[in-house]
Structures are given as structure tokens and as C-alpha cells.
A protein has these predicted regions:
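Amphipathic alpha-helical binding modules
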Residues: 63-107
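Secondary-structure edge/capping motif, primarily at the C-terminal ends of alpha-helices
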Residues: 17-26, 44, 48-51, 72-79, ...
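Residue-level detector of well-ordered alpha-helical segments, enriched
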Residues: 5-6, 33, 37, 54-61, ...
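Short terminal alpha-helical segments
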Residues: 1-38
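Short, charged early-sequence alpha-helical segments and their helix-coil boundaries
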Residues: 49-63, 78-81
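Acidic-enriched, low-complexity/disordered segments with a strong bias for Aspartate over Glutamate
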Residues: 16, 27-28, 46, 55, ...
């Protein structure tokens, strides 16, 4: 995936019909969709490595995807109903990708 494609995917998934809306509505989150998004974030992170700042719109999109998606998804769970392990793992990977970009960490 190119840097431009990755940015487009990040912005789309943070938008009106994106992943965070699906999580807010209680829809099933496909681990492959989340994994593709994490890959896109890592592509963008590689392109920004060493940069002193990032675009405000990108930062807002990353905040939505890295922190609000898992919070929204978690709000639909209960003591008796948990997120499927594959979904949970993919959301943790998504959060890690966002944190790595913000802190300029290469793994």
C-alpha cells in the first residue's frame, strides 16, 4: 500500500462511515479490516519517521481510530459478553500502531 493510499484509508475509517461509527453502532468489527488499517498507519508512520510534527487532520483521525474505536467497541461488552479474541487482539494492534506513530517508534 502506498503512502497516499494509506492516508486515504485512515481518513475514510475515521470518517462518517468508518470503523469508529461501526464500533459506536455495535456492529461486528472484522479483524482483517482493523489489521489493514493498522498496516496503513504503519505505512504512514514510516513516511513520517523523524518528522517534528504531523498534520492536525491526520492527528485527529489517528486519535479517533487509536483510542475511540476500542472504547466504543468495549462499551458494547458486558461481564458475560466479551469481544472475540481476534477482535480484541486487532484493536490492541491498532492502538499500538497509533502510539508508535505518535512516539516515532519503529518496531
Amino acid at each position: 500500500m502506498s503512502h497516499t493510499e494509506a492516508l486515504a484509508l485512515i481518513r475514510a475509517e475515521a470518517g462518517e462511515s468508518g470503523l469508529h461509527v461501526a464500533a459506536r453502532m455495535g456492529e461486528d468489527l472484522e479483524p482483517t479490516r482493523v489489521a489493514r488499517l493498522a498496516t496503513a498507519i504503519r505505512v504512514v508512520a514510516d513516511g513520517l519517521r523523524g518528522a517534528a510534527s504531523i498534520d492536525r487532520e491526520l492527528a485527529a483521525s489517528l486519535h479517533i481510530l487509536g483510542f475511540l474505536v476500542s472504547r466504543e467497541a468495549g462499551s458494547w461488552t458486558s461481564r458475560t459478553q466479551k469481544l472475540p479474541q481476534a477482535v480484541f487482539d486487532s484493536l490492541i494492534d491498532l492502538e499500538s500502531a497509533v502510539e508508535d506513530l505518535f512516539f516515532d517508534i519503529s518496531r
